[in-house]
Amino acid sequence: LHIHYTGKTAHMIDADAISQYLDSDKFTVGLSDPTSTRHIVMNTTHEILSDPAVRKALQHATDRQTISDGIFYGLEQPADMLYATTVPYCNVGLKPYEYSTETAAQLLDEAGWVLGSDKMRAKDGKQLALDLLYNSDSVTEKTIAEYLQSEYLKLGISMTIHGEEEQSYRDNMKAGNFDMVFNICWGMPYDPQSSLAAMRAPVYGDYAAQQGLEDKAEIDDAITKILTSTDETERQELYKSVLTNLHEDAMYLPLTYECNKALYTSALHGVHFGTDQYDVPFADMYFE
């Protein structure tokens, strides 16, 4: 029995390799529901990213469908929200930021970031220049970063990208030493409660990146109430408040929904995914 199983902690098989088996008769590819969300965190204390209009422009300038199809072969679906609607409490009717370079350009124009003769945007003599930090151990993050760099350039946004080895990348993220940085939600069964709770303290980059939000105190207060409330209706309303604020603040740039992937011989039956990303129900698998 040989099963290749890739989840958050095991990337032995990437999307490129799995895609080669999608039309195979001998092997079957299994995909779970979304387990976590691949996204970019924008630092709201940054001089340029402190402006919600710039953050919203980047949301509209990001073609998630092309990232899903071109980089993940459709194995990871485009993400419109920080948490998938299948995550408990997270189906709260948020409106996605539709991909529209026209909307992105309009937002930047109205915010004073206008195109110069060099086709780059500037405001009061300052260029619209950002930096994106990625984990150099992740080929995928580098590929996405290079794609976004080229796409944003078409709008007159200068974005440098740089990778750091995992520990340095994590240290800088936690300290808030970034303009923009790749991140992944905690995933099931920790989302949304545990990952939101961690935003109230400098555990990861969220805390530092949220310091420029006008509604930071309001968000933290609602999260604290979620942790103590035993009334399900109240909890749902509090979650809706937090998720709506974070979505409208536009500091989280969702890219794709990560899922667990299984590649196995088609003679094997009973292969399915467990209730969380680390649960592999081997006991249910069998050969006839």
Question: Residue ranges of each PLM-predicted region?
Answer:
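Extracellular/periplasmic solute-recognition and catalytic clefts
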Residues: 1-46, 57, 69, 184
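Short, solvent-exposed loop/beta-turn-alpha elements that line the ligand-binding surface or hinge
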Residues: 18-35, 41-51, 88-109, 116-128, ...
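Append "and occasionally in soluble cytosolic enzymes with long acidic Gly/Pro-rich linkers
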Residues: 30, 49-150, 241
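Extended ligand-binding regions for polar small-molecule ligands
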Residues: 45-69, 219-236
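Bilobed periplasmic-binding protein-like "clamshell/Venus-flytrap" ligand-binding domains
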Residues: 69, 111-134, 181-185, 229-266
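Ligand/substrate-recognition segments at binding pockets and active sites
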Residues: 114-187, 260
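Extracytoplasmic "Venus flytrap"
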Residues: 134-142, 194, 208, 212
